[in-house]
């Protein structure tokens, strides 16, 4: 079955990851190695009538694990439900290596949280994701997701469809109130934030040094 295959894949990763850690320990490199474990997406496994990955932005697909270990440097046993993006890994490593982070990078270093210098309860006010084959339609629907600590907005661009969930009252994401009366203020505010985030991520190119 699909779930049995999924469990088998988890065991395979667990076994091979264990081999890697054991090698680092056997070669006396574990204490001087930063280990980062994550993945690019989750699996539906039947949730919302879907299997495998892709086409939607439910929590089971976009909420992925992120485990960071560095014995003696990263605070042990620390857990956080703060909003984090995988793009935060790069500035985290840059801070560890004492490399200045350019202003144009969107990621935020997790190092202050990992070392206990900052509370683990909050990191970013929102996170964003994009998918370029949403809804599995032949015309390749573009879609974006914006999620803050309470709400999740999904916009399927060009076809007038969307989703809006209150994750505090509806953590399973079953009640889409995109079209409900009274949702306009929340929806419009989040659409604006998502549009701003999209534009702020555009590469500005080299600085102009001559007259226009």
Sequence positions of predicted segments:
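C-terminal cap/loop subdomain of S1 sulfatases and analogous C-terminal strand-loop tails that border
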Residues: 41-47, 87-90, 95-167, 172, ...
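Short glycine/proline-rich turn/loop motifs
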Residues: 1-4, 70-73, 171-174
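A short, conserved beta-to-alpha structural element at the edge of catalytic cores
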Residues: 65, 69, 192-202
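A short beta-strand-to-alpha-helix junction
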Residues: 3-12, 56-64, 74-91, 97-109, ...
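Histidine-centered active-site microenvironments of extracellular/periplasmic hydrolases
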Residues: 22-78, 85
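A long, amphipathic alpha-helix that forms part
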Residues: 1-33, 192, 196-198
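Phosphate-coordinating loops and pocket residues in cytosolic domains that bind phosphorylated ligands
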Residues: 47, 176-179
């Amino acid at each position: 079955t699909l779930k049995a295959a999924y469990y088998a894949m988890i065991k395979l990763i667990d076994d091979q990851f264990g081999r890697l850690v054991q090698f680092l320990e056997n070669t006396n490199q574990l204490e001087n190695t930063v280990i980062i474990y994550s993945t690019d997406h989750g699996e539906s496994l039947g949730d919302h009538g879907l299997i495998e990955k892709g086409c939607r932005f439910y929590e089971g697909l976009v909420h992925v694990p992120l485990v960071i270990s560095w014995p003696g440097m990263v605070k042990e046993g620390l857990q956080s439900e703060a909003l984090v993006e995988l793009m935060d890994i790069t500035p985290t490593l840059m801070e560890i290596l004492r490399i200045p982070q350019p202003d144009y990078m969107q990621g935020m270093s997790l190092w202050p949280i990992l070392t206990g210098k900052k509370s683990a309860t909050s990191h970013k006010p929102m996170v964003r994701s994009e998918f370029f084959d949403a809804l599995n339609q032949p015309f390749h629907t573009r879609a974006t997701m914006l999620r803050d600590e309470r709400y999740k907005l999904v916009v399927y661009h060009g076809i007038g469809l969307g989703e809006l969930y209150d994750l505090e009252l509806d953590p399973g994401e079953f009640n889409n109130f995109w079209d409900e009366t009274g949702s306009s203020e929340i929806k419009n505010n989040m659409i604006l934030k998502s549009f701003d985030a999209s534009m702020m991520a555009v590469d500005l190119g080299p600085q102009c040094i001559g007259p226009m």
